[in-house]
Amino acid sequence: MRLSRYFMPILKENPKEAEIVSHRLMLRAGMIRQQSQGIYSWLPLGKRVLDKVNAIIREEQNRAGAIELSMPTLQSAELWQESGRYDAYGKEMLRIKDRQERPMLYGPTNEEMVTDIFRSSVKSYKDLPLNLYHIQLKFRDEIRPRFGTMRSREFMMKDAYSFDLTREGAEHSYNKMFAAYLRTFDRLGLRAIPMRADTGPIGGNLSHEFIILADTGESEVFCHKDFVDFDIPGESTDFDSVEGLQAIFDKWTSLYAATSEMHDEAAFNAVPEGERLSARGIEAGHIFYFGTKYSEPMGAKVQGPDGKEHFVHMGSYGIGPTRLVPAIIEASHDDNGIIWPASVAPFDVVVINMKAGDQACDDTCELIYAALTKAGKDVLYDDTDDRAGTKFATADLIGVPVQIIAGPRAVANGEVEVKDRKTGARETMTIEAAINRFVA
């Protein structure tokens, strides 16, 4: 992508409305723009990151055996009246009527709808277990939306829903998502700590929030510091192994970890003083087991091996991609801008032409740009006629992991400079070596 033809409206000054680092940097880097209170457009640079976050989420959901579908944003109020949540949910839910005056709602979550899909399609235990997920925009009318897309009214959510014949089966499905979430956050460059949490309006009797430690977090959290160094389940994790997944769950729930809502001061004080960690955190994911809370009132049941009908046991599992993007920035930035993990960076490398219009610099940059693009790399080519300082500031601000810098003096020697955005380390190498670093 040539920067001269790309839409990336950089802001030179810090926006006054931005309260936290991620909000400020996302606005300055031209990733998002506010349309109304708590509602944002994702501009091209931001959407590239969001798409890569979603790709990782999809890969890990699929690896754990979940199946993607797509459900509508608008839902019938009748389904929510069936479950008993229509009146209980409160003013966060946006209620509307269609032209026939039928009550509808802009879905804040999808337990009712997915249960309706299940009950009309699945009749036998032989079709279980089943886990369905989708990635969709949702709306919750927050009293005080703030921090950009960290706490917005319209947001994107990956929500998955599991269906099992028994509680034991449902707990295995819960453990699958538990392990999948640990892997997802790790691949995003984040360390998320699962903490026992309140079930809230979703309901149920088992729930964990996945918390990313950050000074700007909304919640106060308390945990054992060893969580910071726990090993993440590997790529070879067997998601069909009941014992293996239970061992992962047991390990990650063996030490004290709780949000402020579930905090037990006495239990926390029992942790040796030097091993206690109290901090602030960002909720990045939330999983629930709620048994037959929805299947019973909505009649979602299957015929079991005994020939009798059984209400299915359910769980739901949410991750907010539009919240994860700022969470990654909160965890990885410096005074100059964002430092993206390679897995979600909008581009793999930025090629910086220090003297656009100089034949040698132009030819060198075109050569590198073409070679890396042909190799399947996402490349941003700064071919603008901006000053060198502006080019460097832009590259640092948007956080692309590697910068390849081509100036007249280096190019005359057949060389370019390669800079690592995270460490700041610079290395001069031949043009061929710079290309081979990415295509070898």
Swiss-Prot record:
Its EC number is 6.1.1.15. It catalyses: tRNA(Pro) + L-proline + ATP = L-prolyl-tRNA(Pro) + AMP + diphosphate. The keyword Lipid metabolism does not apply. Pfam families: HGTP_anticodon, tRNA-synt_2b. It comes from the Bacteria. InterPro entries: aa-tRNA-synt_IIb (IPR002314), aa-tRNA-synth_II (IPR006195), aa-tRNA-synth_II/BPL/LPL (IPR045864), Anticodon-bd (IPR004154), Anticodon-bd_dom_sf (IPR036621), Pro-tRNA-ligase_IIa (IPR002316), Pro-tRNA-synth_IIa_bac-type (IPR004500), Pro-tRNA_synthetase (IPR050062). Keywords: Aminoacyl-tRNA synthetase, ATP-binding, Cytoplasm, Ligase, Nucleotide-binding, Protein biosynthesis. GO terms for cellular component: cytosol. The keyword Secreted does not apply. Gene3D superfamilies: Anticodon-binding domain, Bira Bifunctional Protein, Domain 2. Homodimer. Catalyzes the attachment of proline to tRNA(Pro) in a two-step reaction: proline is first activated by ATP to form Pro-AMP and then transferred to the acceptor end of tRNA(Pro). Belongs to the class-II aminoacyl-tRNA synthetase family. ProS type 2 subfamily. HAMAP family: Pro_tRNA_synth_type2. This is Proline--tRNA ligase.
